[in-house]
Design a protein with these regions (language model features):
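Active-site helix of classical SDR
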Residues: 30, 66
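Active-site-adjacent segment of SDR/Rossmann-fold oxidoreductases
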Residues: 55, 76-87
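C-terminal beta-strand-loop-alpha-helix "lid" module of Rossmann-like NAD(P)-dependent dehydrogenases
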Residues: 82-131
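A short helix-coil junction within the Rossmann-fold of NAD(P)-dependent oxidoreductases
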Residues: 32-41
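Substrate-binding pocket helix/loop in short-chain dehydrogenase/reductase
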Residues: 6-7, 11-16
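Active-site loop immediately N-terminal to the catalytic Tyr-X3-Lys motif
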Residues: 7-8, 55-61
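Residue(s) in the substrate-gating loop at a strand-loop-helix junction
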Residues: 50
Length: 190
């Protein structure tokens, strides 16, 4: 689920919906399957994060926060369940052409805000264009199937448009100021 709007203007209800779906949904699913995996002393958990969980996306801040939470949770969980031979993997999709764009909840308060409105609408237009021109979902499905089939899959798998994957990977070695500048340029934030 995605909520588009300025972080400052988001309602507590919007934030709770975002976190309950994207983060606590993952937590609850893991809690449901872990007892049987521990008993079997094996298993594989594949949590879906996002490239937006690697870097904050403007006007998608609580979406990014929910996916950052999935990242941290998955890192800690992988360590905790290692003694039980349970693998934890995180898939970080970039933009895919799915129904996500059409189902995004748009903050009317942000759209109409004198300070955020114009910047928000420009950024939202870029975000929607990238999503509509994103990869076919089969690419994501194929990446997840590879993880399922591998005995020792990588902890993280980034998948999506090559430029997004490259940019997300570059966060490890690019200075924060450069990343912030590039994101401001890309999302037309002055």
């Amino acid at each position: 689920i995605g909520i588009g709007g300025a972080l400052e203007l988001a309602t507590e209800e919007e934030v709770n919906i975002q976190m309950n779906t994207n983060f606590f949904g993952v937590v609850n699913m893991c809690k449901a399957v872990l007892p049987s995996m521990r008993k079997a002393r094996k298993g594989k958990i594949i949590n879906i994060s996002s490239i937006g969980g690697v870097m904050g996306i403007p006007y998608q801040g609580f979406y990014s926060a929910s996916k950052f939470a999935v990242e941290g949770y998955s890192e800690a969980l992988a360590l905790e369940v290692h003694p039980f031979h349970i693998k934890v993997c995180v898939v970080e999709p970039g933009d895919f052409n799915t129904g996500f764009t059409d189902n995004r909840n748009i903050s009317e308060q942000t759209r109409l805000d004198a300070d955020y409105g114009e910047s928000f609408l420009k950024s939202l237009g870029i975000i929607e264009k990238e999503e509509r021109n994103g990869c076919h979902p089969r690419k994501l499905g194929a990446a997840i199937c590879k993880i399922v089939e591998r005995t020792n899959p990588p902890f993280r798998t980034k998948v999506g448009p090559w430029i997004q994957v490259l940019f997300a990977k570059s966060k490890k070695w690019l200075p924060d100021a450069v990343m912030q500048y590039a994101l401001r340029i890309f999302y037309a934030i002055k």
